[in-house]
Every structure is written in C-alpha cells, then in structure tokens.
Amino acid sequence: MKKGLFITVEGIEGAGKTTNLNFIRSILEESGEEVVMTREPGGTPMAEEVRELLLRPREEAVSSTAELLLMFAARAQHLEQKIKPTIERGVHVLSDRFTDATYAYQGGGRGLSWAMIQDLEKLVQAGFKPDLTLLLRIDPETGMARARKRGALDRFEREKLEFYFCVQEGYMKRVAEDPERFLVVDAQQSLEEVQAAIAQGLAAKLAG
C-alpha cells in the first residue's frame, strides 16, 4: 500500500494557517484522497494535555528548556499514536505545525541551541520529516494585529513583537536548511493569490 503524505503548515500567529489548512484539505478530498487533520502541540489525548500546559497563561515563569522538552514529549506521542499509523494506512496527514515550529519558536524566539533541538529531533523522529511544508510568511506586526482580533491570547500570543521577528528568522533558517521540502507563500497577498500559490505547489507535490 502506498503511504499517505505528511503535510505541515507553519507560520506565526495571524498568518492564516487555519484557513489554508482547510483549503488544502478541500483540494485533497475533492481529488478523492482521505485526509486526517491534526495539530501540534497536541493531536492525541495525552498530547492535548501537554498542549494545555504549554499554552495556558500562568504566573510561574516557564523554563525555555522545560518548554522544549514538553514539545518533544507531546510530539513523540503524536508520532507513534497518530501520524505514523495514519500514513501507513495510505491516508494523508495534514498538521497545523510540527518540528519546524520548535526550531522557530524555541530556537529562534527563545534563543535555545539549534544543536540541542537537532539532538531531540533525532531522538524522537529518527529521520522522519514532512513530505511538504507550507510556510505562510507574514509581517509580524500584521500577524499579531490579526491575532489580537480573535479574542483571548494564549501564552505565546502574549509575547512581545520582537519575539515574533526572531521566530520568523528561525523559520527562514529552516527553509535555507531544507529548501526542497518548503513551499513559502507571502501571506500578505490577497487570499486568492495565496491559495493559487498553494494549489500550484500542492499539485506539483502530488504529481511527484
């Protein structure tokens, strides 16, 4: 049986990930493909509990290293219980964030060692990575203005603007390391232009 594709969507807050995740799902389903949607951190009952720990605003300062380890703990569970079994069945998995977000947020935003993240990635993933990653790139000021309109902010959304410029740099460093895997789209274009670029990139991946 042919394995399903593992497709991830990345970007800072306000980049339009939810809208475009649903757009990708509709393209795949209209072509007769089965798709499972998931997210990180989260994706399984245990991993969702870790997500709540990570995102809930709290008075206690959270160690950046603790944050990183929790991300990979949730990812280990997510991979073994959901992502890998699903693609083995020939079903595509579409995820709102994956390991690139860890490099961007904990590496770029928090300033943690890239090498430390790489070591954890090797331990947890053993070479496993997405087949295609869509990175929606948006100016952090624009993205955060959009995010604030959605209502209550989680612990990450409360970070200062400078944090998101560092996150964006982290994402672009990841693109430079593995350019063939990424489809980078300017999310400040009109929705029609963004989705035309996504559709073209997805079609090329499916054809390959």
Curated annotation (Swiss-Prot):
Gene giving rise to this polypeptide: tmk
Presence of the UniProt keyword ATP-binding in the record: yes
GO CC terms, sorted: cytosol
EC number, as in UniProt: 2.7.4.9
Functional summary from the UniProt entry: Phosphorylation of dTMP to form dTDP in both de novo and salvage pathways of dTTP synthesis.
Superkingdom of the organism of origin: Bacteria
Record-given protein name: Thymidylate kinase
Binding site for ATP: 11-18
Keywords for this protein: ATP-binding, Kinase, Nucleotide biosynthesis, Nucleotide-binding, Transferase
Family named by the database record: Belongs to the thymidylate kinase family.
Native source organism of the sequence: Hahella chejuensis (strain KCTC 2396)
EC class: transferase
Keyword check for Kinase: yes
A Gene Ontology molecular function term of the record: dTMP kinase activity
HAMAP family registered for this protein in UniProt: Thymidylate_kinase
Pfam families from the UniProt entry: Thymidylate_kin (PF02223)
Biological processes, Gene Ontology terms: dTDP biosynthetic process; dTTP biosynthetic process; dUDP biosynthetic process
Catalytic activity: dTMP + ATP = dTDP + ADP
